């Protein structure tokens, strides 16, 4: 049966690091102080039962998944679905991944409506892409079509996006004047389907 080799508490961050194993093999697990208290505060040398070990492993995995999610979101914006799938690909369980995504949403690190607005505005005003291209592109990143439509409509209503003006800028940038070429460009950049 595994034994507790060390316990390190951090009352500010409200978590505890427990070293469990034998003299040759030590693994560190991070749990909340509440979980540590629920285990009846095991001290150095005490044995850990199967049930307690399962609880410690589950909570440690959730803690690591949350930290990894913060790292992924620091790189760039992701949808809830994309973040969850990335965590699962990294080897975390579905439950730990879902918990990490929920925690990111609760703390405001993952705000899909705001992310969508920024992404739609960037695609429309800077990359000069049309409504249908934007929908296809962002749906491929894991955002729902209804949320994408809502973000596009909101930005158009606020006057932040004018697809007709953007198309004229695109034609001017490309030096296109004939109607045939303009029609071709409309389809290619998603102004028409």
Q: Where is each model-derived feature located?
A:
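An alpha-helical, amphipathic repeat domain used for nucleic-acid recognition
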Residues: 1-193
């Amino acid at each position: 049966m595994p034994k507790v080799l060390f316990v390190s508490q951090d009352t500010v961050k409200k978590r505890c690091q427990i070293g469990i194993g034998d003299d040759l093999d030590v693994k560190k697990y991070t749990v909340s102080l509440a979980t540590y208290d629920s285990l009846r505060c095991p001290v150095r040398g005490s044995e850990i039962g199967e049930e307690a070990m399962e609880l410690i492993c589950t909570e440690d995995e959730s803690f690591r998944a949350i930290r990894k999610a913060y790292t992924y979101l620091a790189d760039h914006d992701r949808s809830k679905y994309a973040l969850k799938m990335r965590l699962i690909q990294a080897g975390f369980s579905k439950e730990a991944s879902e918990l990490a995504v929920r925690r990111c949403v609760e703390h405001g690190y993952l705000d899909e409506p705001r992310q969508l607005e920024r992404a739609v505005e960037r695609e429309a005003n800077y990359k000069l892409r049309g409504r249908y291209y934007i929908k296809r592109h962002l749906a491929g990143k894991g955002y729902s079509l209804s949320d994408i439509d809502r973000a596009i409509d909101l930005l158009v209503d606020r006057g932040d996006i004018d697809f007709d003006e953007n198309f004229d800028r695109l034609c001017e940038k490309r030096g296109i004047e004939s109607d045939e070429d303009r029609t071709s460009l409309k389809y290619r950049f998603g102004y028409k389907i």
